[in-house]
Amino acid sequence: MSLVCRKFNGYNDRPWLVWLHGLLGCGDEWLPLVNLCAQHPSLVIDLPGHGDSTDVRVKDLLEMSCLLSETLAEQRISQYWLIGYSLGGRIAMHHACYGDIRGLCGLLIEGGNPGLFSQQERNNRLEHDRNWAGRFRSQPIEQVLSDWYQQPVFSDLLPEQRQQLIKVRRHNNGDGVANMLENTSLGHQPWLVPVLQQLTLPFVYLCGENDKKFQHLAKRCALPLQTIPRVGHNAHRANAVAFAAVVNHFLSLFNKEYEYDLPERRRTLFPNCMAGLL
């Protein structure tokens, strides 16, 4: 089994950019970024329960990581960067910490939560996500989306932006979204911070300037934060040009070493490059 995906810019011989969307999204939402990052080949993936992978279901994040590896193997992708937003960012971080990372060049995470520290926090989140999942299964999706985008993390959205998101997301399958929300809930996710801090892979944590919650989270967890100006939680959608500029700059720090295949150099180069970026 593998996920539905599409390849772009495959004539390039650099490592692939593998784009993982958030809950309620689909692979195609990354296309503006794919076009702006055309010096790398790109693979956009529809996650389980979403887009053309609506009928795919995973039981947890570990199975999701295995499915990601199977998809990459089927596409014959041997070297790749993971770029993930929100749920996609959590999947990417979990994969880097606990999955098969052969060929993984690095992580670019946008607003992904690295986990909840206490069991009580995880239990509360499980209840929260089960409630939303129940609504996605049983209520008209436009009604649920209208409430979903009233959550504090989306407070920077203008009314017209909120309505546009509802219009785009209303084609989702409620059961598919609900299954993914429950089975990959933040309440099931391990506390990834200690493992993330030990990674030798290049890693940057991207966050909108107006997304105070995730900026605070990144600083509290000592993640390598880089802010995108004048945008909130969904930075890549709000300002694709600025987001792509940061992505391209970060990748440019490592392009030559992959051309010359020097993995040992990457391990020593990364801290200095990150200091220059931030």
UniProtKB/Swiss-Prot annotation:
Keyword set, alphabetical order: Lyase, Menaquinone biosynthesis
The keyword Nuclease is assigned to this record: no
Annotated InterPro entries: AB_hydrolase_1, AB_hydrolase_fold, SHCHC_synthase_MenH
Top-level lineage group: Bacteria
Biological process (GO), any one: menaquinone biosynthetic process
Molecular function as annotated in GO: 2-succinyl-6-hydroxy-2,4-cyclohexadiene-1-carboxylate synthase activity
Pathway: Quinol/quinone metabolism; 1,4-dihydroxy-2-naphthoate biosynthesis; 1,4-dihydroxy-2-naphthoate from chorismate: step 3/7; Quinol/quinone metabolism; menaquinone biosynthesis
Enzyme Commission number, as recorded: 4.2.99.20
Catalytic activity entry: 5-enolpyruvoyl-6-hydroxy-2-succinyl-cyclohex-3-ene-1-carboxylate = (1R,6R)-6-hydroxy-2-succinyl-cyclohexa-2,4-diene-1-carboxylate + pyruvate
Pfam families on file: Abhydrolase_6
Function text: Catalyzes a proton abstraction reaction that results in 2,5-elimination of pyruvate from 2-succinyl-5-enolpyruvyl-6-hydroxy-3-cyclohexene-1-carboxylate (SEPHCHC) and the formation of 2-succinyl-6-hydroxy-2,4-cyclohexadiene-1-carboxylate (SHCHC).
PANTHER family from the UniProt entry: 2-SUCCINYL-5-ENOLPYRUVYL-6-HYDROXY-3-CYCLOHEXENE-1-CARBOXYLATE SYNTHASE, PROTEIN PHYLLO, CHLOROPLASTIC
Subunit structure: Monomer.
Family according to the record: Belongs to the AB hydrolase superfamily. MenH family.
Descriptive protein name: 2-succinyl-6-hydroxy-2,4-cyclohexadiene-1-carboxylate synthase
Organism of this sequence: Photorhabdus laumondii subsp. laumondii (strain DSM 15139 / CIP 105565 / TT01)
